[in-house]
Amino acid sequence: MNILLAWELGGNWGHVSRDLPVLCRLQSGGHNVLYAVRDVTISSPLSASVGIQCIASPMGAAISRMPRNLAGYAEILFADGLGDVAILRERITGWQHLFTEHQIDVVVSDYAPSALLAALVAKIPSVAFGSGFEIPPDVALLPSFCVGGAQDESARRFSEGLIVYNVNRVMKQLGGAPLQQMAQIYQGTHCVLATFAELDHITDRPSGALYAGPVQELPGSMAASWRTTNKPRVLVYLRGMGLLIDEVLRVLGGIGAEVIAVLPDAGSIRYVHADVRMFRQQVCFDGLLDSADLVIASGAGSITLSLLAGVPVLLCSACSEHEMMASRVEEMGAGIAVRAEMVVADAMHHVLHDDSFRDAAVNFAAKYAGFSQKTAIATVIDVINKASSGHS
């Protein structure tokens, strides 16, 4: 079977660390796999290291960096160019050319709506594997990313209507069936959520969703270990938050913590002390989480792995996606989100010294004690096999 895994939206290591384990398992099972990615710079060397063929996804015209704090799914698609019919058509036909060239039997989407539209036109079975944020629910109006989302309902209806209008213009040109609503981009797609229900970004997803759990394993991750036993052990993984990173490290220095900080794109760091080790590349969390006292992070993958190890989280949000995840963790009682009006030192002290946060994380870990990433990967592969055979 020829399988294309398409990554179109989002960035950084989280997508690659979720995609490559699935691709490797498929390839070892005798399938031909192709990885079409948004970011070749990150993905190509990592894919090559495990023998996976990697190419650039069809991006159409040049797209600027995704704005932060968008209000809804339609705004994401507009920002990525789907508000322009020419770009959308170029994107979809680009995917179709790949399908034909490589005789693709199944398309697997990692946050790749244009690839799913192309699969609809080509009548190729499709599977979506991703976080709750990346796989929207099948509802008439997709959820708002904002607190009090009812206030922007009319604007979201208008934006989604424009996206559907543009999509349908292209679908008509290419011989595809029209959409009635934006969620139908996923119509006929077998969806597998790389999370748990408690950590789904969507709080009111319709029943029947398939939760496989997280997959996060990056080849070439550096090994690290704790050096002390008499200090708080804190694991930090943050991107693009220069001022906040400085403040976090300053506070950690003040409490005498041992810190392993993964800061891939941080610039010059002002507050560094002897017990801080900084890494620009990914670090293997195995062996660190078991004896960590706190994790400071923003991404869904790192947060979920921390909670599976029973470690509470200080949540630092840089976008709506992070905010939605932070709210779920706070509802669970396993962490605190640092917001503009908060003092980092107070929030950190609260999580470290109030046992209720660790208790909530430990309870979550106990509930999913039987979980393994191998099982999650097996679930995805089972769905891919069923999709290819035409089963529901």
Where are these regions (language model features)?
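C-terminal amphipathic helix plus adjacent low-complexity
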Residues: A183-I185, A345-S392
